[in-house]
């Protein structure tokens, strides 16, 4: 089939590479426009755009897929199907109607669970043991189109959102190619999603990532891993923001009776009390500084056991 791939961030590259290496003819790539990045706010091309250029594939960067000029360009390419991974813009019906077999999205959950922008983060945050990736035909309703295929992936106890997303992208690459193959030879038909089990995964905002130390340790662990690497879990210390890397559980004996948000500062580690048992901080990043081990941070800041941080969204 003639295919036009749509995607923008790094996570889409494994699928782009798999499609490019498949028997299908990759005639173009669609991605978001160059965007300012870094301290100098220089315009940079998306990771997908850069990879497409390495592959020698033409790149389209419409300001919005509703633009008539873009739709004419797409129509001229005569695509049979448009595989999509994290493109980052809503597709109007006029664009959806152009490819013969529509637009096929790879979504990083086992639909109908976790429809929306942040399925991996929400699966970890909810404490799910298993998640997956699904290929489905895009329709107007959010992530509600009929599905072609699904893969499952166990969520490991130490998985961050970044870890899990990387595995799903690698596994999903094979799923996407198999889906395109099945569409081409007629062996695969899209099936409506189940009406039961629908859940939603809206974007996780920075404020959502603030840790409430009065919550149980297991909930805080899930939250921190779900928000790693982005937007990054955080708390406050003396009014300054402190970003948190993944935490580990301290046993009940090691909790030292610490109250929520109360520090237990040792020579080699730093504990924080929660609504249940304490957690042990891993790496942290103070405001305006580089990431460091929690013990080094506490030593440099001259923090002692009993200091309270970010308690119930306000310090005391």
UniProtKB/Swiss-Prot annotation:
Residues crossing the lipid bilayer are: none
Q: Where does (6S)-5,6,7,8-tetrahydrofolate bind?
A: 109-112
Which domain of life, per UniProt? Bacteria
Keyword Lipid metabolism present in the record's keywords: the answer is no
What Pfam families would the database entry show?
Formyl_trans_C, Formyl_trans_N
Could you list this entry's UniProt keywords, alphabetically sorted.
Protein biosynthesis, Transferase
Q: What's in the GO CC field?
A: cytosol
What catalytic reaction does the record list? Answer: L-methionyl-tRNA(fMet) + (6R)-10-formyltetrahydrofolate = N-formyl-L-methionyl-tRNA(fMet) + (6S)-5,6,7,8-tetrahydrofolate + H(+)
The record's HAMAP family line, in alphabetical order, gives: Formyl_trans (MF_00182)
Q: Which PANTHER family match?
A: METHIONYL-TRNA FORMYLTRANSFERASE, METHIONYL-TRNA FORMYLTRANSFERASE, MITOCHONDRIAL
Instruction: State the family it belongs to.
Output: Belongs to the Fmt family.
- Functional description taken from the UniProt entry: Attaches a formyl group to the free amino group of methionyl-tRNA(fMet). The formyl group appears to play a dual role in the initiator identity of N-formylmethionyl-tRNA by promoting its recognition by IF2 and preventing the misappropriation of this tRNA by the elongation apparatus.
Any idea what this protein is called? Methionyl-tRNA formyltransferase
